[in-house]
């Protein structure tokens, strides 16, 4: 299990864009399972929507990508590098995510070739699928 400080050592995201609270499981380079506790105090709820708060779907996908990044960047040869979003395929939103929900974020790498990889990503709330997608990423370095 990784806490928030350990996650911040692996991925560069910070508030308000760090969308993973803890990692429950990680199999380096293969898969990871994380948690996002969705609080009523999330900044995005101010505008999405003021009278009926719903977590934006793109942020659910971003949270999944961050969990996938932890899995990939935990691998020894990728440490200190960045995982860039390279694509989203077959994305479906099946359940609204509201304040008080706990998102379980699971990403399993299905294919990795060189610096490019694909993963199957599923976000659930109370065992119900909220979002599923295939995410593509590219491993790279910071450019000075």
Curated annotation (Swiss-Prot):
Main localization is: cytoplasm
Q: Which residues form the active site?
A: 48
> What Pfam families does this protein's entry cite?
FabA
Which organism is this entry from? Bacillus cereus (strain ATCC 14579 / DSM 31 / CCUG 7414 / JCM 2152 / NBRC 15305 / NCIMB 9373 / NCTC 2599 / NRRL B-3711)
- Keyword annotations of the record: Cytoplasm, Lipid A biosynthesis, Lipid biosynthesis, Lipid metabolism, Lyase
Q: Which family does it belong to?
A: Belongs to the thioester dehydratase family. FabZ subfamily.
Q: Known InterPro entries for this protein?
A: FabA_FabZ, FabZ, HotDog_dom_sf
Keyword match Lipid metabolism: yes
- Output the GO biological process annotations, alphabetical, semicolon-separated: fatty acid biosynthetic process; lipid A biosynthetic process
Extract one GO molecular function annotation from the record.
(3R)-hydroxyacyl-[acyl-carrier-protein] dehydratase activity
Q: Does the keyword Iron apply?
A: no
Highest taxon of the lineage: Bacteria
Q: What is this protein called?
A: 3-hydroxyacyl-[acyl-carrier-protein] dehydratase FabZ
Function, as annotated? Involved in unsaturated fatty acids biosynthesis. Catalyzes the dehydration of short chain beta-hydroxyacyl-ACPs and long chain saturated and unsaturated beta-hydroxyacyl-ACPs.
Any idea where this protein resides?
Answer: Cytoplasm
Q: Give any Gene Ontology cellular component.
A: membrane
